[in-house]
């Protein structure tokens, strides 16, 4: 579900950082770990 939401824009960048730190959040990053 890749929708352009104001709530998903900012967290999107944070999620990328978290994706690198926590592999558990790789799912949020789109499975690109």
From Swiss-Prot:
It comes from Escherichia coli (strain K12). Encoded by the cryptic lambdoid prophage DLP12. To equivalent protein in phage 82. This is Uncharacterized protein YlcH. It comes from the Bacteria.
């Amino acid at each position: 579900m890749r929708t352009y939401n104001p709530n998903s824009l900012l967290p999107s960048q944070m999620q990328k950082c978290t994706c690198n730190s926590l592999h558990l959040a790789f799912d949020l990053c789109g499975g690109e770990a």
